[in-house]
């Protein structure tokens, strides 16, 4: 899957990634003008043992970052790239701790709540765990699906591992015994693009899909609590209103029980309120932008940061004012962070025409009745054409009339 630009926030730490590079800085003025840049193309690579007929290594990656995330406390940051590497960082101060190899290209990753392990989901449907405490240790196979995994999450108490796949399923497995399945959350009609366990309501799960819905679940029982079609919230006059899309990011603000969604490069961000008591999602606002939105993330107590495809204003900060989310006035911190991104804009230039790779995951529609009627019409046309070729040519006075056998004999004797 291709990867567009990404944004991650934890505490005051902010990371922007694009191509093979990541840029880490701080949103706090007290941290000074801190800046950390890492390029995966400069990281160590495992020697390629498999070679093609020409003797050259095969299956070389482009070092593009495919997924990344912070640990719960923000002490660690991890990324994976399409050269099949898992790169772990310490964030205070920023330092690369290890570069490890994964079996297959990864689609999603997460830390356990204890921050002792990293769970990595890959394209073949497997989840591997890697130790944080032993940063150079190898991976361990934990569980597997029969189809591609698109996201992985853990419950806040580390008891359950939740996985989302291409075949519309969300599986809830026991972390201590992943072969033991607690439940399935079934209801989506397309691939499940993102899942998110609500941290301050740990029994609840949010999920999104290629079916353009956001759903709320009680995941241990597999019970769907609420379904919100995103297409019902957009204006039909928008140029992208008839486009099929999937949510590429679910981000959450615990302080206000607020959910924000960015959608596969569309110039919008959906805002919802989670009503945990009523077990429902309440649509609050649809933020629209002049440029495509790459990613969005909440900074607790500060607001919603939005990364967009605009070199002049790559980052926009929104805050709630009178019940509505509005663009915050430009501050010294915002100017400083945007300046860092502008200087390093080259890492984002290749992301301009790249989506999150969901377009190839939709089910192929098969209209059997249309195919049947088309083939039937072709068959009738062929039969008519065959009869036309077999019919005798018309005489000078029109088509020749067929004669009965008796008439033919009488005509011959006269």
From Swiss-Prot:
Belongs to the WD repeat TRM82 family. This is tRNA (guanine-N(7)-)-methyltransferase non-catalytic subunit WDR4. The lineage of its organism: Eukaryota, Metazoa, Chordata, Craniata, Vertebrata. The keyword tRNA processing applies. One of its GO terms (molecular function) is enzyme activator activity. Non-catalytic component of the METTL1-WDR4 methyltransferase complex required for the formation of N(7)-methylguanine in a subset of RNA species, such as tRNAs, mRNAs and microRNAs (miRNAs). In the METTL1-WDR4 methyltransferase complex, WDR4 acts as a scaffold for tRNA-binding. Required for the formation of N(7)-methylguanine at position 46 (m7G46) in a large subset of tRNAs that contain the 5'-RAGGU-3' motif within the variable loop. M7G46 interacts with C13-G22 in the D-loop to stabilize tRNA tertiary structure and protect tRNAs from decay. Keywords: Acetylation, Chromosome, DNA damage, Nucleus, Repeat, tRNA processing, WD repeat. The gene is WDR4. One of its GO terms (biological process) is tRNA modification. Pathway: tRNA modification; N(7)-methylguanine-tRNA biosynthesis.
